[in-house]
């Protein structure tokens, strides 16, 4: 993935938080009003507290004071503090509606791009999920902390500086400004020092997670090779490296906090000495000194808040950068993917050729190679110069040795990969057709039967959500699933089914779609012999269907209209069972070997 600088990331995040509707713009205006009013009421409450202290001093010293005035100041202080708290809390609650919209839009867009860019990007599902989860969490933090915490803190600082100047003059404002500037400079320097650990910590964390995931995924291999202790030791070494980096980072954070606290402690002592001297000279009252102390402590709290956000912003932006780079990479892959040039949403159906001798599927000098990657520096050619025609209504079997490219042929028809050469489905050139329209006219079962960990009903109806219940039951029966439905029910989840039962669910889903073209990749390989023959007989009796099957069992070829034999990515033989047996070539040898 390409990287981007921090300013670009910040601009992208700001654009994501931009209001997208009048209601959201009004909500942002209310949030801004909450920020302004909340901090203004906070500063006013500090001044009111000084008046209360002055009144209490008069009671103790002279014994005469307007008690009702003190009560009024106390009531005003209570109202101001309550309003300040109410507005301060309201802004975060209101802004959460914006952050929720941003995260939802980001996640939906990533999922949409991932589905369109599948097989064009190298990222693994687990890695993609980790980046999206971390990135969305950190985007929320950046937006919330920046707009509802950092912005109010800056506004509060401006109000406090103004009030210090108005009430106490430059004599006190200058040292406060100098300390704030030193605080900011020191924080920036320490953040630069801390930044050197940031990337190493992320890399070490990812390395540990990847090591655990790979060990769990390949646990049988680890045990078979007696490498349990080796893997544990290797993981321990990587974790020691990670903890050392995190310890250094914590030390840097500790030094940052220590320096920040020391600066404002010195300022507070300086202000206290000057304030006490002014109070002794009757240039300042006790209440004024209390207000000044409160201002200094409030400035310290605001600077501490900003420093904390700046301290964590680097880590947050790292995950945000990963998510934005992932988004851009998926967008490029989707633009280069199958059917990217076609207006997928604007084409209602896949154009078809006039009836007659038009082919349902036609390959013309088609080649395909998996793209180069870090794992595979040399592109692996899977198909080379493949040409054949499958007529409408034909039942065709594709056979060959493992790795010969049989499954890839079906995947290319489904527009799951880019290819060289021409592929036509019902007379339509794939690259000028809508992927949605082409796939909508095809019922398919891919290798290893992809299913969701949901109910039988959910998986059977997947892609056909409006199918009637009676149709669902009928296709479950046709797929041999009736006994499973009676025993376990339609709401049983996939993990409660065996491999053969899962394959029946895939068959029922394909039958329910009732598409004119069916692509079946070893769709009955896990069924028992009786069920397999029943399902195969049902498919052979389907009228008006073009069926293309990748076969694992050669007994079926005798009942098909034609057989395509693929070897090493090229078509070696094409014909009926009897024709290929007469050639006494590869098909004859495979058939003879299967009977022995």
Curated annotation (Swiss-Prot):
UniProt: ATP binding residues: 370, 400-411
Gene Ontology cellular component annotations, sorted alphabetically: membrane
Keyword tags: ATP-binding, Membrane, Nucleotide-binding, Transmembrane, Transmembrane helix, Transport
Subcellular location: Membrane
Gene3D superfamilies: ABC transporter type 1, transmembrane domain, P-loop containing nucleotide triphosphate hydrolases
SUPFAM superfamilies, per database record: ABC transporter transmembrane region, P-loop containing nucleoside triphosphate hydrolases
Superkingdom of source: Eukaryota
Protein name: Probable ABC transporter ECU01_0200/ECU01_1410
Stretches assigned to the ABC transporter domain: 361-593
Membrane-topology descriptor: Multi-pass membrane protein
Xref: InterPro entries: AAA+_ATPase, ABC1_TM_dom, ABC1_TM_sf, ABC_transporter-like_ATP-bd, ABC_transporter-like_CS, P-loop_NTPase, Type_1_exporter
GO MF, one example: ABC-type transporter activity
Coiled coil: none
Family: Belongs to the ABC transporter superfamily. ABCB family. Heavy Metal importer (TC 3.A.1.210) subfamily.
Transmembrane segment boundaries: 26-46, 173-193, 289-309
Domain ABC transmembrane type-1: 39-318
